[in-house]
Amino acid sequence: MWYSDLDSFEPAFALDVQLANGKAGKAVHSVSASGIWTRFRNRFIGDRAFYKMALSLVVPVIIQNTVTSFVNLLDNVMVGNLGTAHLSGVAIANHLMFVFNVTIFGALSGAGIYGAQFAGAKDWQRFRETLRFRLLVSVIITALAIFILTGWPVQLLSLYLQGEGDPADSAAMLNFGLQYLRIMLWGLLPFALSQSYSSALRDAGETVLPMRATLVAVFTNLVFNYVLIFGKLGLPALGVQGAALATVISRLAEFLVVAVVAHKNMDRFFFLNGLYRSLRIGRDLTKNIMLKGMPLLVNELLWSSGMVTMTQILSTKGLAVVGALNIAQTFTTLFGVFFFSFGTAVAIVTGQALGAGDGELAKAQVWKLMFFAVAVAGALGVLLSISADWITQIYRTEAEVRSLAAAFMRATALCMPFQAIANCAYFAIRSGGRTLLTMAFDSIYVWVFCVPYTYALVTFTALGIESIYPLSQLQHPLKAVISLVAVGSGIWARNLVGEKTESALTD
């Protein structure tokens, strides 16, 4: 159930309506235009101080994610210059990396819920324990991922190579994917540990250091990609293996920067004092994080596997679709970071407000951040749609692949405002610890609706991929409607670390 008290639900677009009954029993509606604007402005538009605060949180994340996505784009172009088989092989390997990355995000989210609220409550001892939890769970998940990816790499990669096309091309893609994947495994642990530190720092309100660490990583990745892929500075040309090695080096650099700099500034990040003095995490706190975090971990695992399953289903329409999806997703990610980054602001702002006991402030801020994100997403969607054909020309690949990629980008661009709504709603619901609701809203939606719907389009219709892909994107408007209802209910706005739960969080 999205909300438990219908009487308390106030629609986002409330109107000033006065009803007067005439002699004939007809209702006369008088709507004040100025009243509508006043309510709209109060609900969705903040003052200068609000936007200054929001941008101070969002801009470093936007810079971090934009630079990361831009360098990923350059990597993508470099690998694409080696050939379509190289590009597609790396793409399918990165689908598996995507599942790992998102699973790490989900594993850290449970601790992040409490971390943000402990930061709001200034309880730094238990905040430190949430960081210990993040580090331990990251190591465990990394070990499981390495076990799976070293045990069944061929079987997993082959799932994406079942579409129509030359068997020789399919074999080449598999070979390049295996070369890339085997080296990428060495970068899993540094990535997981750096995400543990960065997420804790962000929960404490520190977004600049994670941004700087990422900037170091992406520029390291860019330089080593150019040198190792093409064999510059006297080094051998390693192709896709060079791309993987560059990524591993960059992830190690990111971890070293964020960890070393943070520990050298413990006067600012005093919650790091005694971090490794013991591995103690309060029993009840561990239980609560697991209760809140396990649904998030399962959610992210199911969501990411659902997304790659949809990609696999679409890829059965032909090998050209694999390369086209990779190009399209690279650019939609680059454009999307501008509004997806608002999710970080929603998580921090609402989490700290809830931790400080101000649920009404948390509710008010979500609507303003969501409206801001939607406006940004709409503008970026128009820009992406206009530039899609030009963008694909930078790739040295077949005309069919470029044409499909442009069509995919235009379809995604139309749905960006809806994605922005769902993204902000996800982080708002998560900030209040409504993890089962988060799971229903996210991964269950993907598996109950999106995957079967995409499968039905591919299997039971005679439509081409040019029609199937836009139709598959209709998942986003429906999810946006669900998101508005969920956020409007206010059921998510809970203080998890206040006086009522304080005893439950201590040993």
Predicted regions and their residues:
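Helix-terminus/linker motif at the lipid-water interface of multi-pass membrane proteins
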Residues: T66, F70-S88, L157-A171, V227-L238, ...
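Short runs within selected transmembrane alpha-helices of multi-pass transporters and secretion channels
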Residues: L108, I183-D203, P210-V218, A243-V258, ...
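Transmembrane helical elements of multi-pass membrane transporters/channels
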Residues: S56-D75, I183, S194, A217, ...
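Transmembrane alpha-helix boundary and packing residues in multipass membrane permease domains
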Residues: V61, N65, N76-V77, N94, ...
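N-terminal transmembrane alpha-helices
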Residues: I45-V77, N81-L82, H95-Y114, T142-I146, ...
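Small-residue-rich hydrophobic transmembrane alpha-helices
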Residues: L87-F147, F191-P210, V322-A388, A420-F441
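Short alpha-helical transmembrane segments in multi-pass integral membrane proteins
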Residues: W2-V58, G115-G187, A237-G293, T350-C415, ...
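Generic alpha-helical transmembrane segments of integral inner-membrane proteins
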Residues: I62, T66, F70, L74, ...
